[in-house]
């Protein structure tokens, strides 16, 4: 809780000291799926949640505090979760769907870094079209925006798709 408050205080300080219109969290992901990483903290918390849900609730609490800190100054707050909603939830412990639904963020910008025709091992579930549709289908609180995060670094480099890559042209 102290670390969460420290980060939220930092968000507030940025908003108070600098003429910013928004605060954007990028690559804030949970550092590992290894249960040992925070096992002692989890045990000490006495939580009745599973360790995975406890991790998600910690991230949710951080996001809520930071959103409140930014909004105190009229500053927008948002984040760029990984592009795959399921991976975001299960491997990054970030319940971005909840943030959209509850208005924990003013906007979400999923990292949709795959091409329109992305196919890997016969699976097109990570194509831009599939993932953009999955995010767009999630319920959003009034006023919460959804933006597509694009990976400009892919231009000329491709995305490893079995179907070729429109990033080359």
Where are these regions (language model features)?
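Short acidic, glycine/proline-enriched helix-loop-strand junctions
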Residues: 32-49, 122-150
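Polysaccharide-binding and catalytic clefts of secreted carbohydrate-active enzymes
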Residues: 1-102, 113-114
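Loop/turn-rich, solvent-exposed surfaces of beta-rich toroidal or solenoidal domains
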Residues: 106-119, 123, 148
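Extracytoplasmic/secreted cell-surface and envelope-processing proteins
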Residues: 32-35, 87-89, 116-127, 156-165
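Active-site clefts of carbohydrate-active enzymes
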Residues: 74-86, 132-169
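Well-ordered, non-membrane alpha-helical segments in soluble/globular domains
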Residues: 58-64, 92-93, 124-134, 165-169
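Short, proline-enriched alpha-helix->beta-strand connector loops that line the catalytic pocket
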Residues: 103-105, 144
């Amino acid at each position: 809780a102290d670390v969460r408050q420290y980060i939220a205080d930092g968000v507030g300080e940025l908003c108070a000291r600098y003429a910013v219109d928004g605060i954007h969290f990028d690559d804030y992901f949970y550092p590992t799926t290894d249960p040992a990483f925070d096992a002692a903290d989890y045990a000490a918390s006495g939580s009745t949640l599973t360790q995975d849900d406890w991790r998600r609730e910690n991230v949710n609490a951080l996001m809520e505090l930071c959103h409140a800190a930014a909004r105190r100054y009229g500053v927008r707050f948002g984040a760029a979760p990984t592009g795959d909603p399921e991976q975001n939830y299960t491997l990054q412990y970030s319940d971005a769907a909840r943030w959209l639904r509850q208005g924990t963020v003013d906007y979400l910008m999923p990292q949709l870094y795959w091409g329109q025709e992305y196919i890997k091992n016969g699976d097109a579930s990570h194509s831009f079209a599939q993932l953009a549709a999955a995010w767009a289908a999630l319920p959003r609180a009034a006023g919460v925006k959804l933006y597509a995060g694009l990976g400009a670094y892919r231009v000329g480099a491709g995305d490893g798709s079995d179907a070729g890559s429109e990033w080359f042209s």
